[in-house]
């Protein structure tokens, strides 16, 4: 049994001393930037981390072997609520808790032999990182990409902080699981909507480079749609009730159904609904119902049954002139299309469900093209019916003609809408990057001076879990205005942690010599960016990956970066499961990587992780399979004793080999042939490992020491990115070197002793023959004719065609 602990420590010390994983500063070299999503420093790494970083490390080591200049950095997404929760629970400062965890996790990661650049390790809570992040914030603010406004937000009472829509899951906070309520608050917003079109259009450049599922999820989240926007006018009585409000805007993607409208529906947050409540235009019972729905998050409303209330208001149909009742409905989103819809229950499932519940009219305006009766709601394409001059038109044609009518009469227009909303980035917590803004009673909102950055957090803080700790600090928020010098107050909100993780990939590119000088060194960034291979979980498809794409475009426009997309290729790895469920302490099914390393070694953990399943699939933990991986490495180590020690790899005469020797050599070269596709495209490491195992078995089944020696040299080369410690040890012992280089594929190894050929007569297959591969063409033709004699009787052969190693075709007449 080999001593994995001793062997692995030896090679980790060698790699560290030689600094071989630090990227070279020669920007003329071909480069590869391989990045796995950085972890939150929760205290210990888990098997999900091991899988993520083993995949990235295997790819990185492969490209170094191919002669590329490789950047593979690591850092920590180190701001966030868990540190504050730990401060309350364990009476420890968030900073100490965070950096203690970073120290421990860094040691764990390097115990696994990951080839990270040690000179570029960062934490987003480092003051130097905060400095440049605040500089970017100020530049975005000055460009109008960040603004402050009052808005109804998702509020978590437990964490006492604002949540982005994406952070609300089934009406609950994504972190603590508590119910989320709606609350109006001031906050800072990133104008991601100003890049909506580019974020959408650039997705086409990522086709075949990103998983299609991620692209679809982002397309749906951005939610671009075309349609008609018009002012829906109140009747005189309703306008009078509302104090002179004349109309409200409506957006619809289905103007072809406008003659089927039977009611209008407003979002609970709509200004008209607010006016109805303020002016007591509905009963107390109805008002209470509206207020109850108002306090539900948008996602909670979507999950509930359709509900609403009549507002005692009517609007006038813009084309027919009919009076249309105006309702509040829980399924209408305040953030989309102005928060108002024209409801057509005959041709929309949600409208139909609502109308059915409240006994509202259902008016059909589209029928089937074949004239047959249809079941409502009918949402397919068809022919307009009972739609004035548009009756008889196909609905797609009618859409444009109805919009043209609205535009001609100047009562509406064609518009583009997005589901994507601006990103709220204010958080009411201590452990986050301070927002570098100052509230001056004279000047208003003023950014801090760049020379005064970073604005850092006070260490003397009391964290109770209630309210904003910075707001309660006795001195920290008091300052002078950078503009006029008057007494002022700092912004006490901190940045959403997704802000921190939206540019870290660009920070990693900065040469360590420029680390303190620039947040992003343009020369280095233009060489390294974009990331050639990004690796992380699909759960980040919308949040992190969309925000990172947005930041890339903003930083490009600010002159820091050149590329429009941050990640050229994306691999989303599956979760690690045990007993069919995601590993968690509550389920008691956690496997501690430290215990696996202690018992079997890092190489065994790496081998199992890459062999157990393709990276894109879920991986089921299997103790016996871990044991099997360990046994394979022991077998590889023990049988290396039969290998000839040499600095020159044997040159082998293929023609002199027997069948077992040829087979063993073939299996080795088949694995070699597979390797480039695995490491560069498919990442199906399990298939490469299986091929190496098969090759090793074949090598051990024959007795030619030269074949064994050549085979070991190649197999160690192929396995080095996966099990680098044992591969380096054996290569040094056997071949006097541990620096692996590409190996040429020898075509003669794949030449078979016998070949199988199809025999066709006039193009029709009549037989198959197996012949020696060195047989002449005339001999092959002779054998082929003998096999198809009955199809040649009384026929004249006018042409004989031989396609080497494939077929013989006899043309007869």
UniProtKB/Swiss-Prot annotation:
Q: Where in the cell is it found?
A: Cytoplasm
Q: Which InterPro entries match?
A: aa-tRNA-synth_I_CS, Leu-tRNA-ligase, Leu_tRNA-synth_edit, M/V/L/I-tRNA-synth_anticd-bd, Methionyl/Leucyl_tRNA_Synth, Rossmann-like_a/b/a_fold, tRNAsynth_Ia_anticodon-bd, Val/Leu/Ile-tRNA-synth_edit
Write down the superkingdom of origin. Answer: Bacteria
A GO CC term assigned to this protein in UniProt: cytosol
Q: TM segments? A: none
Per UniProt, where does ATP bind?
A: 585
GO molecular-function annotation terms?
aminoacyl-tRNA deacylase activity; ATP binding; leucine-tRNA ligase activity
Name a Pfam family for this protein. Answer: tRNA-synt_1_2
GO terms in the biological process aspect are: leucyl-tRNA aminoacylation
Q: What does the record give as the reaction this protein catalyses?
A: tRNA(Leu) + L-leucine + ATP = L-leucyl-tRNA(Leu) + AMP + diphosphate
UniProt short sequence motif 'KMSKS' region, positions renumbered to this chain: 582-586
* UniProt keywords, alphabetically: Aminoacyl-tRNA synthetase, ATP-binding, Cytoplasm, Ligase, Nucleotide-binding, Protein biosynthesis
Q: What is its main location?
A: cytoplasm
Query: Enzyme class, one word?
Result: ligase
Position of motif 'HIGH' region? 39-49
Q: What is this protein called?
A: Leucine--tRNA ligase
Q: Which gene encodes it?
A: leuS
